């Protein structure tokens, strides 16, 4: 029994670390967002997520930034486990790029929007690495024996759509986005795309953990049947 459990140690690292990244990230974002607004409404989505880490006007900025540090670290550990479990080239690319995403999330917690120049660089790194990561996930889905689920594929497509919108709106000279329209402040494409990318990545982490958990149970059941 000990040897069987040990065989799945790295799988369990992926399960727990990816779920932890999603839970911690969701808690930090939700608590900072609720503390910033007077009431829960659709207008919450017009607030850029990175503004929640501003120490000058966000009362829960510390919680938000610490959650980025913790969730990014958890996701990085999950990707280290992916790199060591799956030896094929595509999975290794996913692990490396996922590691870059994790590091960029950590750096966004270390350098929130108050450190504007550094924050712009690390947030651009997050955007680009997320785009490349989900592009490779699309390829991985059609690989024989892939553990990528349809839900993960759907979330990757959503992330790509949101990411490409942000990429088109990005001012490369400043590595930042233009302010929302003063005429139609209720329709801020930048904020909506940021929230869409953020939530898709969080749910992608959840699906990754649940997918590996299902794989463990299936393989264990097959092993017991053989015995």
Residue ranges and their predicted role:
Residues 97-148:
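Membrane-proximal helix-loop-helix units in multi-pass membrane proteins
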Residues 4, 66-97, 137-145, 209:
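Internal transmembrane alpha-helix with an interfacial aromatic "cap," most often the third helix
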């Amino acid at each position: 029994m000990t040897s069987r459990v040990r065989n799945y140690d790295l799988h369990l690292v992926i399960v727990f670390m990816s779920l932890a990244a999603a839970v911690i990230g969701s808690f930090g974002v939700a608590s900072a967002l609720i503390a910033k607004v007077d009431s829960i409404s659709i207008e919450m989505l017009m607030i850029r997520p990175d503004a929640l880490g501003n120490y000058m006007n966000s009362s829960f900025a510390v919680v938000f930034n610490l959650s980025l540090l913790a969730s990014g670290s958890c996701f990085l550990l999950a990707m280290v486990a992916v790199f060591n479990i799956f030896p094929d080239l595509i999975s290794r690319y996913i692990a490396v790029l996922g590691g870059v995403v994790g590091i960029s999330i950590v750096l966004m917690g270390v350098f929130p929007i108050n450190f504007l120049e550094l924050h712009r660089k690390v947030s651009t790194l997050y955007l680009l690495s997320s785009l490349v990561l989900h592009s490779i996930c699309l390829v991985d889905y059609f690989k024989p024996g892939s553990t990528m689920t349809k839900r993960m594929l759907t979330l990757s497509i959503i992330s790509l759509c949101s990411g490409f919108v942000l990429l088109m709106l990005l001012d490369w000279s400043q590595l930042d986005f233009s302010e929302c329209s003063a005429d139609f402040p209720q329709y801020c494409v930048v904020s909506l795309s940021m929230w869409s990318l953020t939530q898709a990545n969080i749910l992608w982490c959840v699906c990754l953990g649940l997918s590996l958990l299902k794989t463990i149970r299936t393989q264990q059941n097959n092993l017991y049947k053989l015995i």
